[in-house]
């Protein structure tokens, strides 16, 4: 047998494997060496990385050592201990119980298994050796006796001592995930709380099951119990014998145990009945309480009307007499109650003589018939809290009004006062938390019971797959906040996913009715073990069977084409050779051929499959999916929940399941690949002898927080990946080369080879960035090294990024070379002198010395400008004409190509790397100085040999691709905030796009001064999100605020809004609209008046709940829109038809608390808008205004912002909630392939006027009331974001002239030290003269006369800000009586005579506006097309276009389209995840609807062409 090789990571040595090696070394040849990973190499194709797998293999090959036992029983026991050591013994949570279990097993044994040493002893001993908790027990002499004996016995043996001596095993606690900030809420410190002296209580009523609202209360109390090392009392509130049921006490205790809450004390309110009764009698005797026999309904009315009861002034004797009747439970006593005498005139209803005791003759579960009177919860609670020593009573804010009553009782009785601390009640959407309502569901048989997975009970959510840890994390994230919010269920399930995703094993299930066979004749029927979890080997292995016939889902098969390569997960690549279809065109089977050698899985479709084999038959599986119980997210106060019960909330699908699923136990959580997470509700049962049937495995789908459906089958990844690949290689394939002589084929071959190396380098980097499998990376690296070797053999030099074969450069004409060499030499002198100046300043040399060096530098710069006609710009050496077309080609002097020069160049570069490395590692100063000296000597040798300064290669092209990988686009908004940049010099990107920011590169010890990152670092076509973020911040439009979703609009952005405002305001005033202002606050009752309207906004409404530290009596909403604020006033103002029409508009801000990822301008929590609200007597008038306003909105976009729009009407699904119909303008952003709503004009009909009573007397029918017809219309600051997305480019913002804050920026050029002061002043005066002239003709102009920035920096700055025209003027221009105008939209430079300045610039500005609109119109025209089938629609949609399709208008159909066109990014990396939604029904469709045309759904007749697309 060949020698085995064990590689050991010395930082984390596999102690068990090393012990096994010691015991088998006499039987097996094995070498041990250090490395980065723990791996056993058996052969080229076989390796083991799991310690237990290594142990098993060594024991099997060295049978004489007997480490794997002597029979099957011992073999099984050893496997148990291997699993035990890897799981239970490695967990810090259960270490104490686990070590006690081990102690019990060793009580009568020398070894764990059998009568000799085995793998069981090795692996358990190794785990304990590295366990901190065990070592601590040994140190404190608290280790269990039998484990200590066994551990010491093994430790004394030679093999264990040998391993312990060679390998240092550092004790660690059980594996802990890397620490990161937890998603937890803010727990407010308790006032007056002292460590160890806090007592809190959890007082549920034993009348039902706990729901997660109760769980929040219990967990908050536990939090303060633990954090203050205090006491938690679990108290059953059993004050009402009618509700109290002993069965529920047991249930609640079980629910509390499920939450891992351990109360310090269990009590009952009934424990204190005697004391409470005495306190009640004390109040009667002191005249603070009275007995009342007023009927309940009358008492309620009197309290509402603040009328005193007739018994309120009864004497104490009379009250005591009536109290005795209550205690006896007599007929009269049962009609009475005891009331506190507080204040019937109080504004707080809870203080109007509340009930303290009532008479009930039912027996009590604990006290039987001892009492006939029972206290109310509100009376008993403060007394029992005081008696039991509760220091802090945690209560929800709904008890706020009762707090005053709580303290009154405490003070009236003179007992100890606990502190009340409030927190918000947990409100969840689409469900009910009331026990009464939940009981109704159970009694009606609409659910399976209190543990139904649709129920919000603790048991219900646990049965649906919620883990206790996930539930605790969710509730902890809410903290002790008092903000009342309605929580989406998605949030709670997203927390749960974080818990289950890292540990849920992965299995396969196929939809039974859609399975398609795939024939793979060459496949062998065999079984291999694969990981249950791709990222967590500790989850274990599962068997996967392979056979010549496998099954896939039909939806996957439909996406295949013949000849296509498809990846079968956990198998490899297969080529589809034949697709068999029946007469209907439906696929019935596939033929495929193995292509397992091809490991390229990037471009392939991934499918799940199951093999047909008698060894492991698929099992029947039923997948159950539950929906919400209630269809409406938030129920109004007076709404009947029964009206919104979802009668179809349970769906089942019959599946063919992975054979491994037969081993699932009830409660096991798994993931079905490409379907989601599931929990086993009913394990699989084999064929029963009684029924002769097998019982399927029932799995319940666990939501994971997605707000959309996960696509299951038929998903493809090709398009995006291929596009990415093409982008990656494009710079190398398409790089222009200079025209050369005919004899340069060798050079061309070299360049092709150079480009291949560059492309392969990108492939390797991409693989590493994506953390691809090691074998894939190794294969790519191997190919890269092979190409580099071939390149070196062909060219005789090492491959260097950014340094293509130099032979090309040698064919350039000699005249051009000489000229460029001279300029290059001068450029290098300037750079070198710049280095001298910087060095002198860094060393704080005398001022005179620095001035002398600066004068020399300025003189060299002037010579350079005279020679080249250009300003000196760092990082932009002079290039020949031919070199302009190839920015990556060297323009070094010919001497560089000598062998000696090449060797010396490489030495300098290498030494530069050494210097940088030493500085990075913060090496000692003397060591750095020696390296720097050596570098300077090498540079001096290089200069003496070549005649020019050493200049590192400025790498472009390949190295540009090596920048940081873009971060995930769905990261949190604050992470996305760009850092503030310091202003500084930078090259003009219009002159040399694609180059590096500075010329420093490999081999540079001290490069030129670092260039400031003024320009954009992201490209619009590569990373739109980063590009957008950089454009709006670097162009000074937006500044981020510390509240997510709220932004500071800087003057540059606000000026655009002002331009829009000025135009629109003037136009609506022509229509008779007047401006006004209404308050931003809305009362809760007003907001809830229009229920449909409120439901649409409910999740986004922000609420004010507190003034200072005082809670408001009722929360106040901040307007999400103003209908509910304005229309009560309209109702007052409209008395007659003569009061109509009312046409009002307000320019204001609104708040909508979006939960999606905020984007400045596009999706924000606060934004500016105008909202118009009008009321008319007739529908015709209202309908006319709707279209008038829509036309004005279109003018804003098309005439001001130069953005074409599509006008149309919204579908029923997308229209404004509460309105009759909505008209809209839709714009298109080709960079993302998504549309965006530009503005909307709604016809509300009479819906709101009926709700708010906006009525007038019908002039035609006297005495008849008529409701007004209303419109509302709005345009927001979203317009600015749309403009940025549509027109912006890779240099920054592009502003249409009509909305630009500055239309022309004047920049003086040529101001150098050589320029006389008179000429400089004349130039500045000329700039100011131009400014004055342009202002006189209403051109918005600014002169940038700052003297601390170069013209190049200013060019960049104003290009980034999108100014339409840059006016450049220099001394030569003044002499020629002209200036240069540079267009921002095209980069075109125009020379304009001075006397034509006003007319020419006005004409150019108008032309820019037209050009921008024309360009955007062409873009929209090419990206908006017609499709008549669903297949065509999906293809066009996925190519980034918007599509007009025949549509029936049904909401269900639209939901189906959205779901069908959705893509999941887990399955299709980079795919747009959202489905298509209807944008509008265009007023002018691209083509007419043909008679009899069908909707794309294929079911209903089409009504009209509707524009669909992905949208913001």
Curated annotation (Swiss-Prot):
Alphabetical list of SMART domains matching this protein: ProRS-C_1, WHEP-TRS
Disease: Leukodystrophy, hypomyelinating, 15: An autosomal recessive disorder characterized by hypomyelinating leukodystrophy with thinning of the corpus callosum. Clinical features include motor and cognitive impairment appearing in the first or second decade of life, dystonia, ataxia, spasticity, and dysphagia. Most patients develop severe optic atrophy, and some have hearing loss.
Span of the annotated motif 'HIGH' region: 204-214
Domain WHEP-TRS intervals: 749-805, 822-878, 900-956
Bias (Basic and acidic residues): 709-725, 958-976
Residue ranges of coiled coil: none
Annotated function: Multifunctional protein which primarily functions within the aminoacyl-tRNA synthetase multienzyme complex, also known as multisynthetase complex. Within the complex it catalyzes the attachment of both L-glutamate and L-proline to their cognate tRNAs in a two-step reaction where the amino acid is first activated by ATP to form a covalent intermediate with AMP. Subsequently, the activated amino acid is transferred to the acceptor end of the cognate tRNA to form L-glutamyl-tRNA(Glu) and L-prolyl-tRNA(Pro).
Effect of residue 1126 to T: In HLD15; uncertain significance; small decrease in aminoacylation activity
Example GO BP: cellular response to insulin stimulus
Regulation: Inhibited by halofuginone. Can be activated by azetidine-2-carboxylic acid (Aze), a non-proteinogenic amino acids found in plants that mimics both proline and alanine, leading to misincorporation of Aze into proline positions of proteins.
Modified residues (N6-malonyllysine): 300
Residues covered by region (3 X 57 AA approximate repeats): 760-956
Positions annotated to bind ATP: 1152, 1154, 1163-1164, 1237, 1240, 1276, 1278
Mutagenesis / variant outcome for changing residue 886 to D: Not active in translation inhibition (phosphomimetic) and abolishes GAIT complex association with eiF4G. No effect on interaction with SYNCRIP
Low complexity bias: start-end ranges: 878-887
Recorded topology in the membrane: Peripheral membrane protein
Sites of Phosphothreonine modification: 355, 898
EC number: 6.1.1.17, 6.1.1.15
Positions with a binding annotation for Zn(2+): 1448, 1453, 1495, 1497
Modified residues (Phosphotyrosine): 872
Protein name listed in UniProt: Bifunctional glutamate/proline--tRNA ligase
Gene source species: Homo sapiens
């Amino acid at each position: 047998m060949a020698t085995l090789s064990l590689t050991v990571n010395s930082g984390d040595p596999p102690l068990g494997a090393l012990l096994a090696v010691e015991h088998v070394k006499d039987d097996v040849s094995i070498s041990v060496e250090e490395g980065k990973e723990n791996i056993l190499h058996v052969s080229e194709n076989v390796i083991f990385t799991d310690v237990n797998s290594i142990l098993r293999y060594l024991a099997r090959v060295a049978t004489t050592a007997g480490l794997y036992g002597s029979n099957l029983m011992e073999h099984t026991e050893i496997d148990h201990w291997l699993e035990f050591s890897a799981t239970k013994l490695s967990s810090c949570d259960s270490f104490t119980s686990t070590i006690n279990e081990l102690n019990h097993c060793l009580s009568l044994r020398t070894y764990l298994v059998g009568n000799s040493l085995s793998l069981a002893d090795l692996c358990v001993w190794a785990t304990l050796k590295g366990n901190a908790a065990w070592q601590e027990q040994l140190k404190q002499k608290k280790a269990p006796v039998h484990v200590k004996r066994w551990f010491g016995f093994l430790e004394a043996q030679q093999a264990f001592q040998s391993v312990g001596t060679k390998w240092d095993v550092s004790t660690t606690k059980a594996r802990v995930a890397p620490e990161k900030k937890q998603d937890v809420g803010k727990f407010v410190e308790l006032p007056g709380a002292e460590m160890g002296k806090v007592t809190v209580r959890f007082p549920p009523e034993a009348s039902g099951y706990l729901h997660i609202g109760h769980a929040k209360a219990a967990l908050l109390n536990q939090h303060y119990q633990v954090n203050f090392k205090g006491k938690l009392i679990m108290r059953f509130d059993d004050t009402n014998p009618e509700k109290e049921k002993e069965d529920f006490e047991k249930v609640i205790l079980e629910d509390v145990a499920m939450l891992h809450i351990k109360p310090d004390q269990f009590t009952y309110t009934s424990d204190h009945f005697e004391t409470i009764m005495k306190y009640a009698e004390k109040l009667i005797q002191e005249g603070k309480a009275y007995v009342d026999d007023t009927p309940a309904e009358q008492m309620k009315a009197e309290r509402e009307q603040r009328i005193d009861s007739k018994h309120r002034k009864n004497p104490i004797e009379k009250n005591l007499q009536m109290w005795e009747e209550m205690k006896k439970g007599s007929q009269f006593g049962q009609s009475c109650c005891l009331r506190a005498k507080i204040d019937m005139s109080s504004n707080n209803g809870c203080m109007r003589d509340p009930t303290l005791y009532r008479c009930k003759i039912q027996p009590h579960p604990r006290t039987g018939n001892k009492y006939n009177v029972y206290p109310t919860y509100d009376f008993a609670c403060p007394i029992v809290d005081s008696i039991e020593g509760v220091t802090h009573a945690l209560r929800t804010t709904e008890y706020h009004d009762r707090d005053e009553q709580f303290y009154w009782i405490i003070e009236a009785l003179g007992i100890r006062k606990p502190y009340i601390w409030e927190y918000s009640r947990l409100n969840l959407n689409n469900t009910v938390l009331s026990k009464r309502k939940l009981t109704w569901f159970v009694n009606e048989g609409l659910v399976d019971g209190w543990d139904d997975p649709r129920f919000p009970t603790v048991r219900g959510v646990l049965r649906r797959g919620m883990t206790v840890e996930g539930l605790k994390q969710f509730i902890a994230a809410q903290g002790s906040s008092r903000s009342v919010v309605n929580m989406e269920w998605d949030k709670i399930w997203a927390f749960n996913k974080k818990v289950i995703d890292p540990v849920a094993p992965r299995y396969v299930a196929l939809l039974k009715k859609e399975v398609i066979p795939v024939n793979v004749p060459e496949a062998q029927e065999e079984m291999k073990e694969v990981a249950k979890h791709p990222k967590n080997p500790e989850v274990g292995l599962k068997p996967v069977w392979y056979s010549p016939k496998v099954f896939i889902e039909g939806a996957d098969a439909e996406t295949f084409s013949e000849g296509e390569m498809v990846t079968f997960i956990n198998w490899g690549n297969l080529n589809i050779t034949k697709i068999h279809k029946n007469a209907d065109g439906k696929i019935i089977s596939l033929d495929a051929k193995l292509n397992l050698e091809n490991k390229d899985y990037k471009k392939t479709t991934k499918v799940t499959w199951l093999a047909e084999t008698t060894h492991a038959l698929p099992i029947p599986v039923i997948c159950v999916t539950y929906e919400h119980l209630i269809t409406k997210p938030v129920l109004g106060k007076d709404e009947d929940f029964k009206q919104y019960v979802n009668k179809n909330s349970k769906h089942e699908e019959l599946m063919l399941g992975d054979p491994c699923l037969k081993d699932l136990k009830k409660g096991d959580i798994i993931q079905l690949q490409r379907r989601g997470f599931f929990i086993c509700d009913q394990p699989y049962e084999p064929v029963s002898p009684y029924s002769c049937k097998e019982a399927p495995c029932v799995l319940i789908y666990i939501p994971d927080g997605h707000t959309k459906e996960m696509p299951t089958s038929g998903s493809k990844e090709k398009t995006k990946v291929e596009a990415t690949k093409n982008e990656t290689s494009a710079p190398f394939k398409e790089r222009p080369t200079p025209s050369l002589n005919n004899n340069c084929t060798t050079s061309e071959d070299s360049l092709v080879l150079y480009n291949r190396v560059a492309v392969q380098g990108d492939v390797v980097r991409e693989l590493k960035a994506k953390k691809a499998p090691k074998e894939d990376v190794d294969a790519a690296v191997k190919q890269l090294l092979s190409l580099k070797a071939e390149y070196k053999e062909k060219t005789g030099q090492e491959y260097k990024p950014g340094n293509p074969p130099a032979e090309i450069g040698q064919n350039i004409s000699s005249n051009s070379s000489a000229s460029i060499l001279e300029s290059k030499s001068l450029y290098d002198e300037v750079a070198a002198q710049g280095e001298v100046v910087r060095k002198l300043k860094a060393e704080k040399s005398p001022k005179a010395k620095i001035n002398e060096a600066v004068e020399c530098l300025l003189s060299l710069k002037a010579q350079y400008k005279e020679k080249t006609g250009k300003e000196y710009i760092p990082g932009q050496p002079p290039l020949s004409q031919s070199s302009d077309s190839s920015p990556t080609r060297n323009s070094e002097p010919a001497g560089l190509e000598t062998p000696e020069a090449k060797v010396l160049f490489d030495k300098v570069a290498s030494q530069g790397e050494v210097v940088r490395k030493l500085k990075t590692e913060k090496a000692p100063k003397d060591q750095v100085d020696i390296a720097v000296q050596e570098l300077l000597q090498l540079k001096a040798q290089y200069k003496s040999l070549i005649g020019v300064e050493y200049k590192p290669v400025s790498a472009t092209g390949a190295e540009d691709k090596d920048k940081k990988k873009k971060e995930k686009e769905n990261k949190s908004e604050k992470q996305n905030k760009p850092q503030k940049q310091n202003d500084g010099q930078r090259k003009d990107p219009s002159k040399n796009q694609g180059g590096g920011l500075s010329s420093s590169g490999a081999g540079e010890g001290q490069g030129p001064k670092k260039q400031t990152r003024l320009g954009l670092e992201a490209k619009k076509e590569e990373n739109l999100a980063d590009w957008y973020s950089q454009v709006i911040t670097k162009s000074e439009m937006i500044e981020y605020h510390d509240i997510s979703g709220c932004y500071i609009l800087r003057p540059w952005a606000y000026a655009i809004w002002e331009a829009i405002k000025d135009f629109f305001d003037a136009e609506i005033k022509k229509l008779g609209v007047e401006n006004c202002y209404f308050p931003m606050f809305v009362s809760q009752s007003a907001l809830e008046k229009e229920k449909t309207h409120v439901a649409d906004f409910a999740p986004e409404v922000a609420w004010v709940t507190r003034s200072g530290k005082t809670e408001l009596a009722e929360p106040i909403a901040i307007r999400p829109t103003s209908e509910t604020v304005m229309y009560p006033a309209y109702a007052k103002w409209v008395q007659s038809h003569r009061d109509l029409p009312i046409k009002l508009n307000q320019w204001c801000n609104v708040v909508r608390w979006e939960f999606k990822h905020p984007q400045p301008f596009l999706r924000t929590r606060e934004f500016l808008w105008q909202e118009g609200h009008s009321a008319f007597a007739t529908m015709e008038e209202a309908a006319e205004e709707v279209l008038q306003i829509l036309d004005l909105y279109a003018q804003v976009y098309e005439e001001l912002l130069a953005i074409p729009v599509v006008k149309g009407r919204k579908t029923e699904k997308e229209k404004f909630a509460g309105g009759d119909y909505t008209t809209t303008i839709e714009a298109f952003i080709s960079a993302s392939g998504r549309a965006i709503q530009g503005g909307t004009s709604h016809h509300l009909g009479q819906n709101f006027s009926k709700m708010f009573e906006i009525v007038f007397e019908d002039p035609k029918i006297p005495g008849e009331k008529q409701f007004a017809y209303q419109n509302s219309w709005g345009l927001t600051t979203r317009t600015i974001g749309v403009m940025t997305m549509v027109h912006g480019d890779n240099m920054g913002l592009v502003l249409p002239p009509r909305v630009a804050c500055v239309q022309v920026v004047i920049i003086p050029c040529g101001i150098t030290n050589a320029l006389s002061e008179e000429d400089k002043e004349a130039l500045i005066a000329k700039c100011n003269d131009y400014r004055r002239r342009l202002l006189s003709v209403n051109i918005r102009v600014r002169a940038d006369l700052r003297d601390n920035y170069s013209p190049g920096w200013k060019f960049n700055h104003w290009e980034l800000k999108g100014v339409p025209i840059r006016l450049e003027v220099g001394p030569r221009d003044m002499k020629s009586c002209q200036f240069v105008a540079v267009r921002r939209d095209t980069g075109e430079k125009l020379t304009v005579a001075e006397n034509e300045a006003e007319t020419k610039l006005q004409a150019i500005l108008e032309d820019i506006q037209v050009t921008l609109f024309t360009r955007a119109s062409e873009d929209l025209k090419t990206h908006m097309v017609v499709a008549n089938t669903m297949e065509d629609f999906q293809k066009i949609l996925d190519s980034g276009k918007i599509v007009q399709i025949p549509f029936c208008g049904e909401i269900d159909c639209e939901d189906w389209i959205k779901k069908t066109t959705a893509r999941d990014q887990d399955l299709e990396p980079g795919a747009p995840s959202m489905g298509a939604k209807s944008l509008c029904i265009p007023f002018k469709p691209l083509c007419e609807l043909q008679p009899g045309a069908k909707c794309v759904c294929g079911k209903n007749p089409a009504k009209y062409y509707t524009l669909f697309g992905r949208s913001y």
